[in-house]
């Protein structure tokens, strides 16, 4: 049996410079991006949210307190996506610990274009620059 506790995130990569929040299909891209960011001297902590509601705000806040920076990665459009809710929660619960504005790497604010899926999705090529920019803020 394999179960995932509802409302419990998992730190899947320890790091000290930037927290990267991801879930679902974007977790693997976040892991690739975190590894690539080490070439730029950035040590990422990757948190797999695993469930979005209830969200494990305590795990998110603990990681943001540790790193002072956060990048949220998800496939949905940036506007009204769940990443916006996460950033709002982080601002409410951990604002004083932020050393840089939270960043979101998301889909674009357009309908999902299946023929252009690889251009639409926030793959590591778009995630790494956001991580580096957030780390160097």
What are these regions (language model features)?
Residues 1-137:
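Thiamine diphosphate
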């Amino acid at each position: 049996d394999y179960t995932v506790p509802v409302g419990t995130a998992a730190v899947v990569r320890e790091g000290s410079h930037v927290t990267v929040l991801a879930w679902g299909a974007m977790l693997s891209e976040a892991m690739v991006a975190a590894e690539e960011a080490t070439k730029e001297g950035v040590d990422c902590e990757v948190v797999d949210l695993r469930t979005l509601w209830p969200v494990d705000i305590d795990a998110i806040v603990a990681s943001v307190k540790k790193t002072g920076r956060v990048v949220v990665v998800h496939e949905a459009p940036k506007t009204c996506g769940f990443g916006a809710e996460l950033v709002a929660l982080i601002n409410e619960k951990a604002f004083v610990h932020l050393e840089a504005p939270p960043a979101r790497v998301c889909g674009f604010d357009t309908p999902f274009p299946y023929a252009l899926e690889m251009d639409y999705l926030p793959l590591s090529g778009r995630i790494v620059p956001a991580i580096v920019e957030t780390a160097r803020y």
